[in-house]
Amino acid sequence: MSLTYMNMFMAFTISLLGLLLYRSHMMSSLLCLEGMMLSLFVMMTMTILNTHLTLASMIPIILLVFAACEAALGLSLLVMVSTTYGMDYVQNLNLLQC
């Protein structure tokens, strides 16, 4: 395993741990999700370039599209929650309430 792969795997693991441990604020959760998506994108791109798979060269672009959609939905949810409740605490969110 090369040093670059190990760094990207460590970045993914740290982002995952940040998502699991520090989930009190919605903004920190969204930043951890973006870090995970970015490290996945870099790892997939490096793997495809190293193995010379021309048929799979579109997969990282599709992942970036999903990451952009996830970021847009997350930010719109963050704006809605912060204007409604005045804070972005994840603990105050309950999907069963109206």
UniProtKB/Swiss-Prot annotation:
Disulfide bonds: none annotated. It is an enzyme of class 7 (translocase). GO terms for cellular component: mitochondrial inner membrane; respiratory chain complex I. It catalyses: a ubiquinone + NADH + 5 H(+)(in) = a ubiquinol + NAD(+) + 4 H(+)(out). Pfam families: Oxidored_q2. One of its GO terms (biological process) is ATP synthesis coupled electron transport. GO terms for molecular function: NADH dehydrogenase (ubiquinone) activity. It is found in: Mitochondrion inner membrane. Keywords: Electron transport, Membrane, Mitochondrion, Mitochondrion inner membrane, NAD, Respiratory chain, Translocase, Transmembrane, Transmembrane helix, Transport, Ubiquinone. Its EC number is 7.1.1.2. It is a multi-pass membrane protein. Core subunit of respiratory chain NADH dehydrogenase (Complex I) which is composed of 45 different subunits. Core subunit of the mitochondrial membrane respiratory chain NADH dehydrogenase (Complex I) which catalyzes electron transfer from NADH through the respiratory chain, using ubiquinone as an electron acceptor. Part of the enzyme membrane arm which is embedded in the lipid bilayer and involved in proton translocation. Belongs to the complex I subunit 4L family. This is NADH-ubiquinone oxidoreductase chain 4L. The lineage of its organism: Eukaryota, Metazoa, Chordata, Craniata, Vertebrata.
